[in-house]
Amino acid sequence: MDIEIKDVEHRYQMKTPFERLAIYDVNAVIKEGSYVAVIGHTGSGKSTLLQHLNGLLKPTKGQIRLGEDVLEAGKKNKHLKALRKKVGIVFQFPEHQLFEETILKDIAFGPINFGMSREKAEEKAREMLKLVGLGAELSDRSPFELSGGQMRRVAIAGVLAMEPEVLVLDEPTAGLDPRGRKEIMDMFYSLHKQRNLTTILVTHSMEDAAAYADELIVMHKGTVKAKGTPRELFSRKDDIAALGLDLPETIKFQKRLEETLGITFKAPILTIEEAASEVKALFQEENAL
């Protein structure tokens, strides 16, 4: 399903002395099957926006259309439960949401809550364990006996067990080491492709945004300031800097290489693999002279 965000505003604690405008005039269209990264500084409104996508927050102005479902300011939505099954959110440190006595029960909890039989829910839980790279032998263990990275995978499996059409990731690699971060991000990308998910990544990492997303949405001080593909946006270095954002390390490397060698690459280098390929091509070109 496509997601259309139209003139959305959200104010916290409305009509109190503590009223605060969090986001305003937010407009965006996210196509079914796309991988979109929402980037911006802390406090830019990224997390507030994502909580609107399954009705955890409702707009105080404007509307969000998710397929046939519409979340609109001032109107009740009778189908929030069904919507929350379609839109799964993986929050920062999702392992903090684990609570059951066994891994199998924890993953099966959501499907059972949505009406699936226990037998089918546990079968689904075993399938999701395998999908996130954990063995079936762990199913009867307490989730609190696992490593931090394994606990995170169990929590992610619990979201995937709901079979969402849209997967929203709020800083999903927070607190992980570089290896763990890459493993988790590669896993999400693989799931995105295999299951034709619409994936929305909220991140501070310009590297992850550049490497995985089809499109970027830049939030700044509560509203959308820029949209485009990673190559389009990261080629506008001055605009990115003006929004207080850093460039991916690969583009910083590209810039140093261009300054040192007096050359200009045709397009921004977004991944380590692209950087390695460009450097290899430079050496081959030099050796051919």
Swiss-Prot record:
Its EC number is 7.-.-.-. ATP binds at G40, H41, T42, G43, S44, G45, K46, S47. It is an enzyme of class 7 (translocase). It is found in: Cell membrane. GO terms for molecular function: ATP binding; ATP hydrolysis activity; ATPase-coupled transmembrane transporter activity. Forms a stable energy-coupling factor (ECF) transporter complex composed of 2 membrane-embedded substrate-binding proteins (S component), 2 ATP-binding proteins (A component) and 2 transmembrane proteins (T component). This is Energy-coupling factor transporter ATP-binding protein EcfA2. It comes from Bacillus licheniformis (strain ATCC 14580 / DSM 13 / JCM 2505 / CCUG 7422 / NBRC 12200 / NCIMB 9375 / NCTC 10341 / NRRL NRS-1264 / Gibson 46). The gene is ecfA2.
